[in-house]
């Protein structure tokens, strides 16, 4: 299997930069892995169990899930990406080109669902953090009434309509994990 597009800033020294400055040039290459045991250590079932059961509010659940990089802590989400790493998984901008990206994100969604289901009524209305990744640039806090542009797949959808995977509260999603 091969991928192309990206990397804009390759993390592996022998991966050539994209031939176009905008990163959209044709540059096929084979998938590669660079397994990182340190990252894998924070993705174990014990770590994930603690994530789900030891974080009572959304702010800390999200912070623990994502990781606190300034403190040298990787979370389950970042740990999953860096466990596989390599090319393209280690390139932030093109990592969705790696099939493992989708398996990893299905698990992240499932962990969110398990955490949310513990106090479903309250957590369907719980929003934390700001509108930008790592609050860069600084931005206001998110709300249930914020619009999420899903592009051609779904148009504009309010955050409140994405809070339940069960289609409740007028939601757009309709699935359950067994």
What role is predicted for each listed range?
Residues 1-178:
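C-terminal accessory segments of proteins
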């Amino acid at each position: 299997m091969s991928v192309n597009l990206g990397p804009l800033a390759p993390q592996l020294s022998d991966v050539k930069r994209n031939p176009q400055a905008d990163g959209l040039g044709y540059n096929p290459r084979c998938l590669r892995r660079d397994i990182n045991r340190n990252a894998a250590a924070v993705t174990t079932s014990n770590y994930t169990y603690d994530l789900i059961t030891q974080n009572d509010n959304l702010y800390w659940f999200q912070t623990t899930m994502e990781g606190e990089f300034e403190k040298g802590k990787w979370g389950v989400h970042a740990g999953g990406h860096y466990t596989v790493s390599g090319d393209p998984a280690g390139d932030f901008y093109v990592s969705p080109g790696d099939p493992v990206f989708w398996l990893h994100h299905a698990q992240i969604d499932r962990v969110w669902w398990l955490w949310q289901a513990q106090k479903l009524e309250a957590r369907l209305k719980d929003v934390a953090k700001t509108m930008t990744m790592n609050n860069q640039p600084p931005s206001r806090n998110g709300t249930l009434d914020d619009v999420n542009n899903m592009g051609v797949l779904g148009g504009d959808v309010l955050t409140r309509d994405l809070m339940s995977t069960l289609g409740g509260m007028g939601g757009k999603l309709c699935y359950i994990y067994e």
